Amino acid sequence: MSGFLAGLECTRCSSYYEGESPRAVCECGATLLARYDLAGIRKAVTPGDIARRPPTMWRYRELLPVRDDASIVTMGEGFTPMIPVPKAAREVGVGELWVKDEGTNPTGTFKARGAAASISRWKELGITRFAQPTVGSGGHAWAAYGARAGVEIHTALPVSCPDLGWKGSLINGAHVYRVDGTVGDVFRLMGEAAARHGWLLAGAGREPYRFEGKKTMGLEIVEQMGWQVPDAILYPTGGGVGIIGMWKGFDELQELGWIGGERPRLVSVQVEGGAIVKAFHEGADECVGARHVDTIAPGIMVVKPFSDHVALRALRATRGWAVGVPDAESLATMKWMNSREGLFMSPEGAATVAAVRRMVREGQLGPASRVVVFNTATGLRYPHLMDGPVPVVPGDGAIDDAAVAQAARARG
């Protein structure tokens, strides 16, 4: 396969670079997005062809940036389940609700998609040393795919992040740095280190190919819904890469003639006071003045996303919305979804369900709405949030009424 990647286009100044350019960002410093020979793809493949392919994100390989199939670094990522949650739908007040469960990906998160696409393409271009600032799950995914590809990964994260993030990266062979500071400090330090040591800085939005991996989430939703779109997609948003990727993917599907002009409303879900939420409701074109807050959901707390201008553009182009969710609501919803629907969601994923409830109260969604929310990681990555006063029964004792009552209290 020769691939259909045509080039890279700047999201700010519209500069264009040929497809074999090793650029990560535009000369002006802004985000680049991949562009494809869509006319060629239209002649080469149909939705029927895709349906017969293996259930991974690479079933859409014509819409991915790798030139040669032999360059693909994969562990079977993508084509994650769309799980209907009818009890939750009734209780939050929408007609239909699905959870796109990204926790089934390798390393347990949606980050596998971006890592697979980016490392595959960059290695194809001869780039083999990467700097990956993270809050945990991204670094783990890049470490795992880096190990599989045989490339060098350097990852840094705040010391406040759960241990699983850095320990997973370490066991996969990455160089790991824990930073006693904020996410902003991590990005600054890794940017400086990348320039000093000659690493490619692969943070969210700072290279074009992660968008392409994340784009496949939207392609899958459309295919799994019979080449239709839902009314709204609620997405846990940190750097905005997934929002941007899906928006881009829907435009490509329309140009291919595989869907019409309708679009789902893209909804950014962040912690309360999140940068994109603040900018969206203030009518701003980029994020200014947001502050770091400690949170149980670090994946949706980024003070100044690199691609904020593109994420905000995507929300407004789709008549979208932005919702901030307090930690207490995310944690309560995490436990509620476990007990009602059996889904062990991450706090970031649970925040999207809480956001649906808020949007119903505000009149943004209603009883006829068909809604998809994202669980971006398995809740198993957050065992520290599931502590509870469960009874300890002596081996020679009994599970008596008091123990049963304590167990009931522990489950909430």
Segments the model singles out, each with a brief description of its role:
Residues 1-412:
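PLP-dependent amino-acid enzyme catalytic core
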